[in-house]
Amino acid sequence: MAAARLAAALLLLAAQVACEFGVLRVVSQTSRTRSRDYCILYNPQWAHLPHDLSKVSLLKLRDLSTTQLCSYLDVPAEDFTNQIALVARGNCTFYEKVRLAQGSGAHGLLIVSKEKLVPPGGNKTQYEEISIPVALLSHRDLQDIFRRFGREVMVALYAPSEPVMDYNMVIIFVMAVGTVAIGGYWAGSHDVKKYMKHKRDDGPEKQEDEAVDVTPVMICVFVVMCCFMLVLLYYFYDRLVYVIIGIFCLASSTGLYSCLAPFVRKLPFCTCRVPDNNLPYFHKRPQARMLLLALFCVTVSVVWGIFRNEDQWAWVLQDTLGIAFCLYMLKTIRLPTFKACTLLLLVLFIYDIFFVFITPFLTKSGNSIMVEVATGPSNSSTHEKLPMVLKVPRLNTSPLSLCDRPFSLLGFGDILVPGLLVAYCHRFDIQVQSSRIYFVACTIAYGLGLLVTFVALVLMQRGQPALLYLVPCTLLTSCTVALWRRELGAFWTGSGFAKDAPQTPWAATQGPVPPKAVGSSLSEQPPSEELAKSPLSTEEAGAADPAKDPDNPVASPLSPSNGDEAQPIPVVKPETSA
């Protein structure tokens, strides 16, 4: 399998037009101490550029930037011997230009482009015929060269090597593993709190949203929608990208609010509420601090939306909003069984491989649909990028940093999909009281899978479908732990997560499962929840007794008023009358 994947990767690389950045060193012909570097785009299939500047000779730049060099009539009487030819782009192919330049003795060809730089491509026969480098230079950079140095300059073309490993991978690793661990822990604990005693309700905004259980039908519909949306983005990227940006702003601000709300509710100030009114949402009289939090979250999202293309700092806001969105989704979406986890991960595993490795054979350009959409099509007129990724700029210093500010990317799907399995493992840990062994093992497996992804990225030097490595690592690890503990059957079916209240490490071993809401009537409790298998302890009875709360004037008839141990509460069976 490994050999087949490597062969497929090599085939894909061969099918694409090679494209690399290089550096043009410009030196003044009158003063050799004055120099400046400029970015160029070249195709190494014509000829490779040396990596070391010290091994490159400075050559005179022959300025024919007003000529397109498409016929022998464009070749000057004095040839290009020991010179770098500078010509304009257009009217003929790159091959025709470089063939004429090489025939006239040029040691290299620079093509000035007023449009976006594209790889100077050709075919295999043409590559074998040409032995001099071909590179594109932007018209803006050429104007800067003439302004600074004049038209008499010496130049050298080279392609400095970049470090194989960049430190930004460490940042992405910490963000991804941290999000999965925190999100999985939060999602599991969120389910437990529904069965634990609650503090006095301070207002309507105190209530938390219920988790959404994912069914196999929902999984299939979701994957079909993903495929459909990805294909639409591939063909209509420039129109749909703004829709995705708008959705991200809305969803990320909601996620940020959900993450910060528990901390804001603990603040001792701004607890006043809005006056009585009939306005939507405001009729619930939210607290002033929650309104301020909502305003803050919307402001952060809007600021990112306005300045999203500021490479120097906008990526920090994007990552912050992205992590908040992922945490919110991990808390909200719940996979009820390991069977559902396996189905989702395997289907998306196939989806990821298909759109990364198979689609290059189906598209005219020979490019992967997934990579094109994730990084933005090269022919996009908007040059916008999809925000559904964590992105960190390269931290290693390199001369090539003047060409672009390259980012390393990790899609939200590579966090959310394994994260849902981690969340399920935490809930199962709580149910079987296993000291979180499933949760810890699955989180470690995710981290190891991500490390394998980074290694593959370094070795293959191209984008990797992270789920190709994350899905086997997390699924096999979780299954192995279940087999080792002889709990595979219960782990596979979830053992009634949706029905039974979990026995948590924080509850007494022989104690009861507390009701969902203090003081609720018997008719509100499902018959399947045996609420009173054993008496409440004195501490729990006191905490659950509204009569002992000086702020609550309503006393519950189900709680003793003398502080003694509460008596068991009778359970009404559906087939008998009370």
Swiss-Prot record:
One of its GO terms (biological process) is membrane protein proteolysis. Keywords: Cell membrane, Endosome, Glycoprotein, Golgi apparatus, Hydrolase, Lysosome, Membrane, Protease, Signal, Transmembrane, Transmembrane helix. It is a multi-pass membrane protein. Residues 20-168, 238-239, 308-312, 363-405, 460-463 are lumenal. The chain crosses the membrane at residues 169-189, 217-237, 240-260, 287-307, 313-333, 342-362, 406-426, 439-459, 464-484. Its EC number is 3.4.23.-. SMART domains: PSN (SM00730). Residues 502-578 are annotated as: Disordered. Residues 520-529 have a biased composition (Low complexity). The keyword Glycoprotein applies. The active site is at residues 352, 414. InterPro entries: PA_dom_sf, PA_domain, Peptidase_A22B_SPP, Preselin/SPP. It is an enzyme of class 3 (hydrolase). Residues 61-145 form the PA domain. Pfam families: PA (PF02225), Peptidase_A22B (PF04258). The keyword Endoplasmic reticulum does not apply. Residues 1-19 form the signal peptide. Residues 190-216, 261-286, 334-341, 427-438, 485-578 are cytoplasmic. Glycosylated. One of its GO terms (molecular function) is protein homodimerization activity. One of its GO terms (cellular component) is actin cytoskeleton. The PAL motif is required for normal active site conformation. The catalytic domains embedded in the membrane are in the opposite orientation to that of the presenilin protein family; therefore, it is predicted to cleave type II-oriented substrate peptides like the prototypic protease SPP. Monomer. Homodimer. Interacts with ITM2B and TNF. Belongs to the peptidase A22B family. This is Signal peptide peptidase-like 2B. It comes from Mus musculus.
